[in-house]
């Protein structure tokens, strides 16, 4: 799991038994896969188009879910644990860390 540069931009991927799968929502211009847990949930950041700011994503059971921190211009997930708690960074006029999980959201300054 990680990302590669194709000469123009980055794209997330998952490597499993020498087989590589691109991890990127349909239509996205770029992605970064940054974390994975033991339930195979992958988290990271993608840009919906070349002019867009980054949005966080989760990828689980072949489904992408996008996430934008409230009032943020940029959001990314960096890690996820086995409970589905996610850590990330966001820009809301300044850079903040945050922790999000099922039913909660906590900003860290």
Locate each region found by the language model:
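Residue-level hotspots at or immediately adjacent to binding/recognition sites across diverse folds
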Residues: 1-109
């Amino acid at each position: 799991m990680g990302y590669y540069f194709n000469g123009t931009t980055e794209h997330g991927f998952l490597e499993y038994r020498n087989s590589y799968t691109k991890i990127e929502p349909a239509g996205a211009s770029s992605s970064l896969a940054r974390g994975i847990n033991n339930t195979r949930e992958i988290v990271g950041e993608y840009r919906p188009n070349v002019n867009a700011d980054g949005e966080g994503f989760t990828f689980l059971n072949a489904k992408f879910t996008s996430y934008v921190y409230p009032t943020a211009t940029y959001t990314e997930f960096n890690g996820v644990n086995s409970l589905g708690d996610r850590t990330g960074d966001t820009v809301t006029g300044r850079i903040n860390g945050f922790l999000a999980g099922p039913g909660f959201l906590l900003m860290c300054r």
